[in-house]
């Protein structure tokens, strides 16, 4: 007792635990601290051990009252009153080593002591707590395995749906493949032709505009020079008028010459203004051509926008493919985890199979003993009737649990039907979405054909 692997619990805690988890009905109500410590009652201790063994080893109450036939007793019916205690001693010798108690003696059941009883019950209490926690861990493990299987199924389903979407997005219908190829080649050719014509006309217009600007600058320079010469000549004329007295004939001839020069200057000015108007008309014509070129540019921009949409669709397809690859990786990892879980479950199943084989063997031996004992134990029929009443109560509880199970199955079936209806509605909505998408693609193809025809008409006019 000095080298314990579990704590010694007080009697009050042990009483509360066994009331809540082991004993039921009047047994739990009548069970108190004085039954265990300081002077334990053998009847209550034996009854408590019997209930613990029933829960741990799944023993029936009637099995404790059967005398084993392998004992060398001349009159086994004489020791039937000692049969429950003998079975308790045999099963306690199996149970207590699992509870880390290796010094069990029959006197612990026949003549229990206070501290010794607390020691044994503390070991059993520790084992039962460990058993319940491990059972919860195992149930969580089973639920996690089921959820992992559900995730694998969902990922496989999403993988399949993503593959179908990728096939629908990447594949062009066979009746539209030739038209799609022809339209793409025509669009490419039109882009090249329009870009070449635009570059050539743009270069030509830029050269003409630069040439006209140079001519305008030169004409303006000459006009300014002539204006400057006229102003200087007027100033000189005024200055000379004040200094020289000219004859009327000279003045007349000089004025005539000046009128001629003014007339020539007016003619030159008129010619320059006419040339300016002509150049202005040419520039306006160039601006008109520029508007047409801008229209072509807008059409090119629309084509680029369509190509950008096509590129985005390809990017979306690539993104879906990446998601599909990630889902495949997750599926592989989950399949590996599934394989590991299956291997662990197989090992546990093998262990359970071995235990089942042992239990079957023991059951066969027990059945054989039971057949031999039935002839001897007819006088304990009255005790069995009481036990049968309790068994009937247990069967009634089992029937109630079965009915609850059927109700749960009905609710799950209803939920399954609702899920099936949701899936059908989702499929119908998806088909409508695909139909609308197909109609939109047909409308875009019609618009593209109309734009190509309009471009061809404009090109043929030019």
Curated annotation (Swiss-Prot):
Q: Which UniProt keywords apply?
A: Cell cycle, Cell division, Centromere, Chromosome, Coiled coil, Kinetochore, Mitosis, Nucleus
Q: Which GO terms describe its biological process?
A: attachment of mitotic spindle microtubules to kinetochore; cell division; kinetochore organization; meiotic chromosome segregation; mitotic spindle organization
Which residue ranges are recorded for the region named Disordered?
236-259
GO MF, one term, reads: protein-containing complex binding
Subcellular localization, as worded in the UniProt entry = Nucleus; Chromosome, Centromere, Kinetochore
Coiled coil ranges:
143-462
Fill in the subunit field for this protein: Component of the NDC80 complex, which is composed of ndc80, cdca1, spbc24 and spbc25. The NDC80 complex interacts with mis12 and zwint.
Job of this protein: Acts as a component of the essential kinetochore-associated NDC80 complex, which is required for chromosome segregation and spindle checkpoint activity. Required for kinetochore integrity and the organization of stable microtubule binding sites in the outer plate of the kinetochore. The NDC80 complex synergistically enhances the affinity of the SKA1 complex for microtubules and may allow the NDC80 complex to track depolymerizing microtubules.
Name this polypeptide is given: Kinetochore protein Nuf2-B
* Organism this protein belongs to: Xenopus laevis (African clawed frog)
